[in-house]
């Protein structure tokens, strides 16, 4: 909905209330302060009507306020403001802490604009709250401040329109729905004066310019513009909270290219902020667009840090590549890649450049990946995560096989057995805490006439029977294909500790292939690692389904329980036709 329509939508109600007889009383101002009755609170008081009104209203309801005042030294009169606030607090019997900071000098030294430098105020408030023992910090932001903030967010083109939050940390802003006129009326009724800050009328400051030049024009056409803009902030904050919750549910194995752009932007913002990185709204949109489209993008952030999006991943720092954890043979050499490097893998010899590209490594990082080569210069080991070995290299050093690599080999052998019986080619094994196989399984759905006979369930049953317990929290489930919801549910019920899978499951995957069920809060959460020997697992699937298609083309027929149909899931379709997953 456009800002224009939101303004129009709020005009009727607001104008009716403003045109009605004015029965505004102190009750409207004091009611939001009732949660603070009898509590120690710190109030930021500048001397203006809003903050003075908040102080007087807190005293009226029985709160226990202390005052903090920042003399920002931006005007010669700021010294008089500080003295005025101190005198007011003395007359009211309220503790007062005054701090003087040359905000202009700080802004120049740190290359801030003056509006940004005013954030120093919250540092002052936090220190004063600690000194006074206050539980919360209260500021007197009003509906006018909220409306101005929404306008600034809109004009800056920010991706999120949230306005001023009612609460952030220990800071509370109880008067965001209160108008300035109500506060002035309240103070006049008390016979209380206040100070006027001339900088609030200085058009060099964006907020002051909006207040003096823009809002009067808006109010001429839309008398309830202030209320409407405050409502935009409230609705925007609700929407933002919902989208933030969706972003927080993304797990390391969730495919980012399937997320809505609004969710991606919030996920990216959280990731960048967690690394202490600043960014612009345009950069955030650019990175989110690249993630959504599966593209590669390299950007330099305002702090000078380079970030990269590639292969559906965000890289904010140089990668920490693993070092060899075994003795190096004397004729092996440690180096980085060179033109023409190749490595012999299970599927044949490949260019190292293609291997690193398929691993979606940032281009700038590919020249940093450590390699080990033999006396002939052939690549034997690649220091990616997990490390990649050439065929026979590990064995030539007398090193034990990588447990997960070996376990996936057993699962692939079971998947091959399933394929030979015209089953969906999926195999699974369960490893105990020592890495020993304690359960094996393959798909037998057609063999047994039961579509719940999946490889994972068979392996879990065998492991539970052998170990004498249904709970397998110290065990690892290794399966050639990303589990479906049924099998993931069984693994959760078994309290499996780790899940390792090979190929992604774009038709029925429950770990990101279709939906990431672990994004929800279950009573148990295993760790997940995908992509182990994924190429071999995917190749087996392609071979099986390629044969199915060729056979179907040679002998047209309606798929039935004995003849697998191409491109199916490991369940029965709505039409009753058995399906298989590719």
Curated annotation (Swiss-Prot):
InterPro entries: CMP_dCMP_dom, Cytidine_deaminase-like, Lysidine-tRNA-synth_C, Rossmann-like_a/b/a_fold, TilS/TtcA_N, tRNA_aden_deaminase, tRNA_Ile_lys_synt, tRNA_Ile_lys_synt_N. It comes from the Bacteria. Keywords: ATP-binding, Cytoplasm, Ligase, Nucleotide-binding, tRNA processing. Its EC number is 6.3.4.19. GO terms for cellular component: cytoplasm. GO terms for biological process: tRNA wobble adenosine to inosine editing. It is found in: Cytoplasm. ATP binds at residues 46-51. GO terms for molecular function: ATP binding; tRNA(Ile)-lysidine synthase activity; tRNA-specific adenosine-34 deaminase activity; zinc ion binding. It catalyses: cytidine(34) in tRNA(Ile2) + L-lysine + ATP = lysidine(34) in tRNA(Ile2) + AMP + diphosphate + H(+). Residues 402-525 form the CMP/dCMP-type deaminase domain. Residues 548-582 are annotated as: Disordered. SMART domains: TilS_C. Residues 563-575 have a biased composition (Low complexity). Belongs to the tRNA(Ile)-lysidine synthase family. The N-terminal region contains the highly conserved SGGXDS motif, predicted to be a P-loop motif involved in ATP binding. Ligates lysine onto the cytidine present at position 34 of the AUA codon-specific tRNA(Ile) that contains the anticodon CAU, in an ATP-dependent manner. Cytidine is converted to lysidine, thus changing the amino acid specificity of the tRNA from methionine to isoleucine. This is tRNA(Ile)-lysidine synthase. It comes from Deinococcus radiodurans (strain ATCC 13939 / DSM 20539 / JCM 16871 / CCUG 27074 / LMG 4051 / NBRC 15346 / NCIMB 9279 / VKM B-1422 / R1). The lineage of its organism: Bacteria, Thermotogati, Deinococcota, Deinococci, Deinococcales.
């Amino acid at each position: 909905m456009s800002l224009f329509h939101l303004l129009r939508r709020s005009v009727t109600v607001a104008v009716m209330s403003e045109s009605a007889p004015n029965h505004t009383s102190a009750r409207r101002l004091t009611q939001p302060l009732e949660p603070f009755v009898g509590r120690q609170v710190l109030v930021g008081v500048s001397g203006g009507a809003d903050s003075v009104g908040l102080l007087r209203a807190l005293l009226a309801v029985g709160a226990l306020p202390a005052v903090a005042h920042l003399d920002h030294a931006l005007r010669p009169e700021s010294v008089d403001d500080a003295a005025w606030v101190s005198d007011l607090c003395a007359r009211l019997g309220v503790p007062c802490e005054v701090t003087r900071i040359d905000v202009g000098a700080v802004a120049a030294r740190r290359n801030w604009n003056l509006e940004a430098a005013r954030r120093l105020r919250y540092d002052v408030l936090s220190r004063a709250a600690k000194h006074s023992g206050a539980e919360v910090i209260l500021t007197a932001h009003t509906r006018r401040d909220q409306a101005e903030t929404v306008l600034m967010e809109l004009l800056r083109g920010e991706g999120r329109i949230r306005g001023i939050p009612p609460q952030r940390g220990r800071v509370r802003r109880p008067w965001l729905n209160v108008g300035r006129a109500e506060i002035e009326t309240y103070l006049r009724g008390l016979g209380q004066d206040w100070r006027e800050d001339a900088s609030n009328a200085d058009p060099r400051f964006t907020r002051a310019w909006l207040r003096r030049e823009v809002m009067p024009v808006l109010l001429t056409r839309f008398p309830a513009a202030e209320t409407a803009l405050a409502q935009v902030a409230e609705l925007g904050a609700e929407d933002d909270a919902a989208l933030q919750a969706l972003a927080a549910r993304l797990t390391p194995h969730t495919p980012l290219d399937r997320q809505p752009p609004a969710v991606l932007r919030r996920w990216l913002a959280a990731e960048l902020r967690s690394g202490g990185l600043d960014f612009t709204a345009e950069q955030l949109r650019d990175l989110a667009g690249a993630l959504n489209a599966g593209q590669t993008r390299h950007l330099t952030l305002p702090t000078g840090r380079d970030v990269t999006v590639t292969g559906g991943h965000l890289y904010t720092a140089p990668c920490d590549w693993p070092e060899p954890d075994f003795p190096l043979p004397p004729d092996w050499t440690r180096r980085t890649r060179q033109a023409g490097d190749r490595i012999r893998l299970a599927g044949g010899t490949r260019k190292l450049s293609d291997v690193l590209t398929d691993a979606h490594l940032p281009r700038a990082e590919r020249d940093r990946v450590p390699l080990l080569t033999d006396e002939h210069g052939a690549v034997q080991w690649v220091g990616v995560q997990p490390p990649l070995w050439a065929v026979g290299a590990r064995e030539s050093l007398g090193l034990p096989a990588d447990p997960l690599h070996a376990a996936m080999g057993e699962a692939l052998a079971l998947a091959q057995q399933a394929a030979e019986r015209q089953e969906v080619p999926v195999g699974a094994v369960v490893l105990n805490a020592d890495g020993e196989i304690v359960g094996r399984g393959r798909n037998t759905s057609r063999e047994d006439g039961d579509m719940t006979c999946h490889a994972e369930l068979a392996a879990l049953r065998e492991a539970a029977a052998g170990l004498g317990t249904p709970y397998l929290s110290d065990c690892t489930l290794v399966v050639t294909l990303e589990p479906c919801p049924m099998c993931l549910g069984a693994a959760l019920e078994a309290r499996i500790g780790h899940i390792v899978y090979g190929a992604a499951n774009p038709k029925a995957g429950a770990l990101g292939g279709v939906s990431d069920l672990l994004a929800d809060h279950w009573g148990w959460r295993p760790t997940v690692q995908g992509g182990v020997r994924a190429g071999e697992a995917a190749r087996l699937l392609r071979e099986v389904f390629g044969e199915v298609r060729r056979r179907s083309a040679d002998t047209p027929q309606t798929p039935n329980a004995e003849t697998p149909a191409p491109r199916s899931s490991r369940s029965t379709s709505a039409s009753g036709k058995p399906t298989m997953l590719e």
